[in-house]
Amino acid sequence: MTDSNGQKDNNQDQAQPADPVVSKPYIMPDDPEEGTNEALVREAAEARDKMLRTLAEMENLRRRTAKEVADARTYGVSAFARDVLEIADNLQRALDAVPAEARANADAGLKGLIEGVELTERSLINALEKNGVKKFDPQGEKFDPNFQQAMYEVPDPSVPAGTVVQVVQAGFMIGERVLRPALVGVSKGGAKPAPAAANGNEGGVA
């Protein structure tokens, strides 16, 4: 009885329909190559930035090195040039020590000596110029402390105050630098220097 009922129950269970299978939409997994491509693009951009920075640093280094080499060529003779200037100054002092009257009445020997000293002094100046050292004489110019050193003032109302009226010692430039400032006498008591051209254009054509 029990077996019969049990068998009947089992048959009833098997006869019941199964739950319907609901299909879920298929979701495509992420493309594994997509992340790889983004990483490659990012790495390439970083590598490019590093390369550009390296190239910029190399270019800056090249420019600095070229400037240092150029400065060394231009200004490397500064100390030697100063020593040569002292010799030229001594030769000029020797020439200045000979009065004009003595020169006019000098015999052949003295004239030859004077001419030899003058030639030597000119040769030294020419040699300096070949090496980038140039002489400048600010006579009559407005005093500029960047290029001149004022030794004294000279009362002279005929010229604007602050004008170089006497040059005790000429100045010298090497490249764009002052190797030795000119020693000068500056006027005082004269009229004030004329205003700069920019100040005189007020109301004029721009």
Curated annotation (Swiss-Prot):
Q: Which Pfam families match?
A: GrpE
Q: What's in the GO CC field?
A: cytoplasm
The biological process GO terms on file are:
protein folding
Q: Which GO terms describe its molecular function?
A: adenyl-nucleotide exchange factor activity; protein homodimerization activity; protein-folding chaperone binding; unfolded protein binding
InterPro entries for this protein: GrpE, GrpE_coiled_coil, GrpE_head
Principal localization reads cytoplasm
Cellular location(s): Cytoplasm
- UniProt region (Disordered), positions on chain: 1-38
Q: Where is the composition biased (Polar residues)?
A: 1-15
Q: Subunit structure of this entry?
A: Homodimer.
Q: Which HAMAP family match?
A: GrpE
Q: NCBIfam families attached here?
A: PRK14141.1 (NF010739)
Q: What protein family is recorded?
A: Belongs to the GrpE family.
* General function of this protein: Participates actively in the response to hyperosmotic and heat shock by preventing the aggregation of stress-denatured proteins, in association with DnaK and GrpE. It is the nucleotide exchange factor for DnaK and may function as a thermosensor. Unfolded proteins bind initially to DnaJ; upon interaction with the DnaJ-bound protein, DnaK hydrolyzes its bound ATP, resulting in the formation of a stable complex. GrpE releases ADP from DnaK; ATP binding to DnaK triggers the release of the substrate protein, thus completing the reaction cycle.
Full protein name: Protein GrpE
Q: Which organism is it from?
A: Rhodopseudomonas palustris (strain BisB5)
